[in-house]
């Protein structure tokens, strides 16, 4: 009907053993003994929009995950124009925001700036996350170092377009948000259809950035990675590009492989 308003009201909740899964999307996993799921159901009675907020709790990593499922329960088509999986508000405090940018041959450069009034936004419109900007943000208290101070992280488990934001309002309150890239995004949600927003992994440390990184390392290594090499030493791969660039032929590649074998490269 042309309106962009949505008045979501609380309808109920469930607490389940184990970590929720996301059909068709990568997500952190967890068995019944190591994780719990909280489902919070919200509904707009007029538009028929129903939203289920999904929280996954993994205490041993100090990690909480967030996703959401949006359902259209009415006959009209609803167009989704913006969809974020996580949003945190910080009522008081002065913070810095840390993000990582890059390009070819210079990936993942560290950038830390004070959060000022207005909206700080990074993202990707390419359809991929890439090394131009990582789908990852850290909000730290002023003065936080590797070993001391409070900090919060959001990591988007999605390799497509994304948008991450940190905003300070007129009262000095800060908001941190992670979700899908809204530019050129308009998804028609038909009657009974469910739209699942990719997952954001959140963690907190009061002992500096090193502990924050370690929380994510342990969670991703043990509860996100899959496959036969999980928990094992990986085979070593020789990189012919750095060795030869464009100056190679069959003979030079065979010589490189023979020398690599002598060094124990599989």
Range-by-range predicted roles:
Residues 1-167, 183:
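Polysaccharide-binding surfaces and accessory modules of carbohydrate-active proteins
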Residues 6, 187-206:
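Short Pro-Gly-centered flexible turn/kink motifs
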Residues 68, 192-193, 238, 260:
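Conserved, mostly hydrophobic/aromatic
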Residues 83, 159, 201-202, 238-243:
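Active-site beta-loop-alpha junctions enriched in small/polar residues
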Residues 166, 180, 207-209:
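Conserved mixed alpha/beta catalytic, RNA-binding, or beta-rich assembly cores of soluble enzyme
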Residues 172-190:
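Short acidic, Pro/Gly- and aromatic-enriched capping/linker segments at domain boundaries
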Residues 203-215:
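Short, Lys/Arg- and Gly-enriched loop/turn segments at beta-strand edges
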Residues 215-266:
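An acidic-aromatic substrate-binding cleft motif
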